[in-house]
Structures are given as structure tokens and as C-alpha cells.
Amino acid sequence: MARIDSAVSSSQVYADGESSSARYTRTLSGARSALFTLLIAIALVFTVEVIVRWSWPDTVAYFADPMRPAWTTVAVFFLAMLGVDALFGREHKAALLIAPLAVVPAFISQQKQVFLSDPLYPTDFLFGRQIMELMPVLVKDRPWTAVGVVAGLIAAIVVGALLLRFAWQNFPKLTRRERLMRIAFALPLLVAFWNIMDYNQFSWIRDRLRVIPIMWDQTENYRHNGFALAFAINLPMANVNAPAGYMADAIDRIPVKPLPAGTTHRGKPDVIVLMSESFWDPTRLPKVKLTPDPMPTIRELQGGNVFSPEFGGMTANVEFEALTGFSNAFLPYGSIPYQQYIRNPIPSLATFFRGEGYVSRAIHPFQGWFWNRTAVYKAFGFDMFRSEENMPAMQKRGIFASDESLTKEIIRQADEVEDPFFFFAVTLQGHGPYEANRYAKNTIKVEGDLPEADRQVLATYAQGVKEADDSLKMLMDWAKERDRETIIVLFGDHLPPLNTVYSSTGYMKGITAERKGPKDQMKAEHETPLVVWSNKTGPKKNIGTISPAFLSYQILKQAGYEHPYYTGFLGKVYDHYRVLDRYMLIRKNGKDVADWLRQPKVPASLRDYRFLQHDMMFGKRYSTERFFKSHAELYSAGL
């Protein structure tokens, strides 16, 4: 009996030892798996930052700096992979899903910064269709990059499929207990992290993790926080909170300038506004000489400059300011009002002129869905939008409709209209990139010490400027023969994407403009020509440099109209400020105020400006009756 008890006891000790050994093995295996997942997370975050920053030292500095959240980002990726592995039921399978979701946007962001100044924002995916439409142009400009991208995508798909098959067959399975433990560990931490990422709310924990939302400077936001966290911070940018102090009483306290008694107009002049794509004065470039002058007409008539809030693209944001008299400075950085915010009727020059009995028409020789223009122009009150879909076929210069053919179409439509009209036209010929063989013959000679590729780009661009200038002269010659007063306004939407032409000539340090800098630098990188001309009174001079938001003030003043908002309120702001940019104010006297939005107190006129804009775009529209009565009457009548 004693021998039996001894045998049972020995067997129990052996079983306990075997169980302990198995637990140790499982624990060691789990630790190895977690460590490997952590290494994948580190490698993935490092790869993403190298791609976006395009700098090995800068990426190393990002990881080495204890004041930046590189390791917080690694922790988030680590937790995400643990959670996804638990869902799939196999170790490390999450890496095959998360890696491309992280690396592909990083590559897109790096490529975006080749053409524009900004990194990739979540809102950029709202206009993916626009990018695909322009893809042939981009491919033509950078064919080897396109070949590399396509080859890389094919290789990535093939490798991904092979890895997925290998993972499904060979990656270790997770037990039910292991899956539950991973979910229980990762999910609460990920949810907690997500809840502290609202940049509108201060978070002590987020601050300790070194995640600092820098919404007023997105370049610094991405540099400090890294691509993944900065991108995540920007996810709620479509939500616009009311500015502090916004309420009905605040709107009621904004004074309305009384309209002059018995205001008369000079026979209701016709108004044509031309926003010329990428139009700029290339003779500003140092170290080069262009002969003959590509823009003699505009140079003679130019009365000032528009300070564009954009560079090399994002035309719709400039257009938004020009038509509404509102400012991008009061909207989240990186937002695109045409894509995100214009969902309901908004006051604009179109509604003003329609209220005065005008035909109000938008004209653009491209597809109406681009930049959501069909819906936006309807919300702005245009009674017609003539686009590529419903206009006669346009003659092309390169792959875009020519300025000459668009001008002829404007003249044709104007001649058919008996009532006074307001036409807003957006040209297309000047759109970049500027491939060497766009035109069969360039008539502008480029002299100077430039690489041949840059010389060809500049010659192509200068030829487009010349043809835009010729088209304006054609329109003016037609207007001079008209009895009714005709006002023509032309301005460029932004500087062209000339890429290395800027750095080769020394005009800019890089190939894209800076978002912040001294006043002279900002003006050099954001000023485009402005012409305000009447067939009865000639050109308006000494306008200076103004934001697009003040164009409505200039147009109505030139036409002899008064309005509570466009000439009254904006006129009051214009009396003090000429440029209203997110990072800089330029006063009437030419003095600049940097980072004005970060000051403890914003000037009262700009505070009220923000209140009125928010009220009409996002708020309760308390200001409608006092500032935009004609807009309200137009829409109440169902027009």
C-alpha cells in the first residue's frame, strides 16, 4: 500500500512539474511574440517617418527626442497589432494589414509635398476623384515616378498575397485564452487613447505623452507629432466649433453701416470676374530674362495683387474667399470649404447680383463635379453653371481648354444676354505641371543660367501667361465696343507649381512656399496680379495687396453698389487690414502682425468678422436680416 501511495505521489509531482514547464513555455512564447510585435511596430513607425520626412537624421532625431511622441506612436501601433492579431486568431497577421495602411498614406503625403506645401490630411481623401482625373497630367510630368509607383504597387500586391498565404498556413494560432487576453489588454488602452485625442479639449495625459496638437501650424504639427498621430489629430477637422462668445447678442451688437440715401448705380454695369489658373508674373524670377514681356496688357493695367492663401493648388479655397467675402483664416487648417462645409445656401456675390436683377452665371471649362462646383455654385445662388458637360467643345492647348476659347465662349454668352449679368469664370489652360512639349512653339525666350529642364518648364509656363494676357486683351477689346459699362476683374488664384525653377533661380529656398515667414517672403510666395478695369473709367490703380476675401468689396465699389456686409462690414475691416491670413495680418499701413490668431485678444473687427462667418456657415444665421437680407429674400422666394 505504501508503495502505491509513493507511486501516486511521484506521478503527481511529475504532472505538476510538466504543467509548470508548459506554463513557462507558453509564457516564454507569448513574451517572444509580444517582443517581435513590438519590434515590428518600431520598424513600421520608423519606416513611415523616413518616407514622410525623406531624411534619415530627422527621423532618428524624432525617435531620440524625449519631448516628441515617437514612442507613444510605437505603443499605439503595438496595441493595434495585438488587437488585430486577436481578431484574426494568429500571431503577427495584423502587420500584413496595418503596414500597407500606414506606409501607403505616408508615401502619398511625401508625393503631395512635392507639388504642394502641405502634408496629407484626412480631408484630402474627399477629393480623390479629382486627383485621379489629373493623374494623366501628373504621370506625364513624372513618368518614371509613375512607372515606379505602378511597379511598386504590383510588387506589393504580389508580395502581400504571398505573405498572407504564408501567414495563414504558418503563423502560430492563438488560443482562445491568448486572444481574450490580448483584446482585454489592447482594446481599453486604444479606446482611452482615442478619447484624449480631441484637440479642442486639453488632456493632461495627452500632454504627458508628448502629443501636442499644433493646429495653427500643420507643418510643425506633423514634424513634432509624426505622421500617424498628426493625421489622427486632424480626423475631426471637419467639425467647426463656435468661437468663444458667439451668440445672438454678440451678432446683434455688430453695427450695420447705413446705406446712403438714394443710392444710384451707373446703369447696372455688367461684371466679369476671371480667376486665372496659376497666373503669376514670371519676370519676378531673378537670374532669368523673358523676352518679349509675356504679360504687357496686364502689366499696364495691374492695380494691385491678391495675397493667395494657397500655393501651387487648392484653387477652390481661393475661389471660396473671392465669392463669399469669408476667410479661410477662420477655418481649420487643411480644410476645404467646397468639399466639407458648403451644404446649404450661403451668401455670395451671385446672390447679391441676382437680388439686383442680374443674370448670375459661373463658367468653367472642366467637369462640374471637380471641387464639388455643381453643388457649391447652386448653394452660392448662381442661376446657371456652364461647365465642360454643357458648353460647346473647347479648343485645347495641351490637354486643357485654352484661355482663348474660353474667352470667346464668355463673349458669346454675354452677347446672348439682354439683362445685366455677373459672370464668374475660372480658366484652365494655366494648370500645371508644365511639360516641355505642351505647345508646338514657345514664343517667349528664356535667358539665364538655368538647367535645361527648368528652362523648358519656365518657357512653357511663360507661353501660357502670354496667352492669358492675349485673351484678356481680346475680352477688353470686345468690352470697349459695348454701350453698357462692363467691369472686368482678373486675378491669379495662386503661384504656379514650377518646382525646381524656384530653387534654381534663388527665388525660394525650396520648391514650394513656406506657410510662415517674414512679410516680404510671404508676399513674394503668395502675391498674384490683380486687374480691376472698366470700359468707361479704365483701370483702378493703387489697390495694393489684398486677400481674396476683399475682392467682393472692390468689385461692388467699382460697380457703384453698397451692401451691409460686402461694402459696409468688409469696408470697415478693409479700413484697417488688407491681408488676412492664418499666420499673418497686414495692416493698411503695411505693418504685419505675425501669429495674430494666437494672441490673447483678437481685434474687435476681426472677432466680429469671425462671428458673422460662423453664423452664416455653421450657426443660427442671426445676422441674415441685418447683413444678408437680399440672400434671405432670394431663397424664401425659391429662386
Swiss-Prot record:
GO terms for cellular component: plasma membrane. It holds the Pfam family Sulfatase. SUPFAM superfamilies: Alkaline phosphatase-like (SSF53649). It is found in: Cell membrane. Keywords: Cell membrane, Membrane, Transmembrane, Transmembrane helix. The chain crosses the membrane at residues 34-54, 69-89, 96-116, 144-164, 185-205, 227-247. InterPro entries: Alkaline_phosphatase_core_sf, OpgB/LTA_synthase_biosynth, Sulfatase_N. It is a multi-pass membrane protein. Its main location: membrane. Disulfide bonds: none annotated. The keyword tRNA-binding does not apply. This is Putative cyclic beta-1,2-glucan modification protein. It comes from Rhizobium meliloti (strain 1021) (Ensifer meliloti). The lineage of its organism: Bacteria, Pseudomonadati, Pseudomonadota, Alphaproteobacteria, Hyphomicrobiales.
